[in-house]
Swiss-Prot record:
One of its GO terms (biological process) is in utero embryonic development. The gene is MYBPHL. Disulfide bonds join C282-C333. It comes from Homo sapiens. It is found in: Cytoplasm, Myofibril, Sarcomere. It comes from the Eukaryota. Expressed in heart, with higher expression in the atria. This is Myosin-binding protein H-like. Signal peptide: none annotated.
Length: 354
């Protein structure tokens, strides 16, 4: 069997070997027809993979953490052969005492065990491979609770309301304020109640205060981390006093209830039997209270022990005790007051039993 030989290559042409191996780098034997001055075939170097960074979507916006939180960012990249990954913070080298970096074959990890506000800033990752380079920028913001407003002042108290003013805090917690929370407390209970939340101005009016109470006020600043740990309290109390009410009485005419006597229920005729007590009734209305006079056959019988006269709430009664045949006749009840008089009559018949 003849030995395998390399194919002949014309002068000035190229030979491309696919899937080359280190063994292929040995120079092939020249064919008998190949001249002494022909070029020797060489193995081409592998094509490099350009460096590229795959930045996670969550890191394309500002990455916000609270003071004391852990920052652990894994950034994948590509490049062949293995590229060189370099981190910077605001254009300067990282502080290795606080920030640690681990670079792998296809990713780089940025780790901060306990983030502080000084760790905020712009972090840049550069992946270099030969003369090629890819960069990615990550903005990290480390925030904490804001400081309290610098002061609070009770400006005015009127009616059921009080006006407050305060100044913004010096420290906003490394982020924008979301507003203020205003609370009130009366001196009787000492309990704090929120009256305003997420309030953006530095002055407000607190209404619906209760008469007779004294109030203190305090204001918290608020950001993404929450309310400030402390709040200033007004030194002056708001005393809600009851306004003196002056009543002006209007003159009015006193109603005159005076009237002359008038019988609303007259006497009724009756027939009785000898020896049985008999009562006569009538009703009268008058003001002032009238004087009641009883008559028999137009003769005054006041003071006669045979008769008993009573008057109560305008009801007049006359009791005839054990009437006899001579007690029959015309009985009259007369009512008299300064405005006039009135009278009613009835007939009483006394029968003797058989």
């Amino acid at each position: 069997m003849e030995a395998a030989t390399a194919p002949e290559v014309a002068a000035g042409s190229k030979l491309k070997v696919k899937e080359a191996s280190p063994a292929d780098a040995e120079p092939p034997q020249a064919s008998p027809g190949q001249g002494a001055g022909s070029p020797t075939p060489q193995l081409l170097p592998p094509i490099e993979e350009h460096p590229k960074i795959w930045l996670p979507r969550a890191l394309r916006q500002t990455y916000i953490r609270k003071v004391g939180d852990t920052v652990n960012l894994l950034i994948p990249f590509q490049g062949k052969p293995k590229p060189q990954a370099i981190w910077t913070h605001d254009g300067c080298a990282l502080d290795t005492r606080r920030v640690s970096v681990r670079n792998g074959e296809q990713d780089s990890i940025l780790f901060i065990r306990e983030a502080q506000r000084a760790d905020s800033g712009r972090y840049q990752l550069r992946v270099q491979l030969g003369g090629l380079e890819a960069t990615a920028t990550i903005d990290i913001l480390v925030i904490e609770r804001p400081g309290p407003p610098q002061s609070i002042k009770l400006v005015d108290v009127w009616g059921f309301s009080a006006t407050l003013e305060w100044t913004p805090p010096q420290d906003t917690g490394n982020t924008a304020l979301l507003g203020y929370t205003v609370q009130k407390a009366d001196t009787k209970s000492g309990l704090w109640f929120t009256v305003l939340e997420h309030y953006h101005r530095t002055s407000c009016i607190v209404s619906d205060l209760i008469i007779g109470n004294s109030y203190a006020f305090r204001v918290f600043a608020e950001n993404q981390c929450g309310l400030s740990e402390t709040a200033p309290i007004t030194t002056d109390l708001a005393h809600i006093q009851k306004a003196a009410t002056v009543y002006k009485t209007k003159g009015f005419a006193q109603r005159d209830f005076s009237e002359a006597p008038k019988f609303t229920q007259p006497l009724a005729d009756c027939t009785t039997v000898t020896g049985y007590n008999t009562q006569l009734f009538c009703c009268v209305r008058a003001s002032p209270r009238p004087k009641i006079i009883w008559l028999k056959n137009k003769m005054d019988i006041q003071g006669n022990p045979k008769y008993r006269a009573l008057t109560h709430l305008g009801i007049c009664s006359l009791e005839i005790r054990k009437p006899g045949p001579f007690d029959g006749g015309i009985y009259t009840c007369k009512a008299v007051n300064p405005l006039g008089e009135a009278s009613v009559d009835c007939r009483v018949d006394v029968k003797v039993p058989n």
